[in-house]
């Protein structure tokens, strides 16, 4: 199975509109440094499973018939907005598997078009896609949110966004079933103020170190990064390693 990162930034993307910091300036000059909103796709047996649906070129990148299913982490707009265009397509239905959020996002449930929202993922209740076992894992976020662990041929990859820390039951699961890759959001550089940390809705780098120590993944990849986090990373290269690093748009992980 192969996972490809469609985007690795937070909702502001990189470069941030109107920002003249060094990270955003470099991204304007070099398109390879640009980052779209975090999402990915899994490729296996010639089929494609989208993880969230926010890529600006989604319908061009995946022509009709190429998307087998869509797997949503949650219904915040920055993770689903491409569905609002995709739903008005023609042809076969596309199944969208999502957390059992009764509100969804705006009028997607009311006017689904070619999208089928009838399948709901439940925490720790595994299901199969193309021979890959997918286990939904609860996350800590302001909207009902699930990460997903993909297992094939003895290898595991966990895609866990959006979250601030991990629920205890998810930590226990990841300790019982160690993963080769854990991919999660790191929106913030280390925040020292306890009050500020208590109000977070995404991981800071302290959370990443805690997750690493508790869950002990073989590799830990960071996504949903802000331009501030990227600037901090440039100034603190010693905080990263070959096994703990920020992922890039277009990066592929094959297991």
Protein language model features and the residues they cover:
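Conserved beta-strand hairpin/beta-sheet module of binuclear metal-dependent hydrolase folds
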Residues: 1-61, 145-161, 181
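Divalent metal-coordination and catalytic microenvironments
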Residues: 3, 74, 134, 148, ...
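Active-site metal-binding loops of divalent metal-dependent hydrolases
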Residues: 8-9, 53-55, 75, 139-141, ...
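Glycine/Thr-rich phosphate-binding loops of Rossmann-like dinucleotide-binding domains
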Residues: 13, 59, 80-81, 106, ...
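Active-site metal-binding motif and surrounding structural segment of the metallo-beta-lactamase
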Residues: 46-97, 178-180
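Short amphipathic alpha-helix with an adjacent loop that forms part of the alpha/beta core around
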Residues: 60-64, 127-130, 170-176, 255
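Metallo-beta-lactamase
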Residues: 93-146, 151-153, 244-253
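Cap/insert and terminal regions of metallo-dependent hydrolase folds
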Residues: 165-254
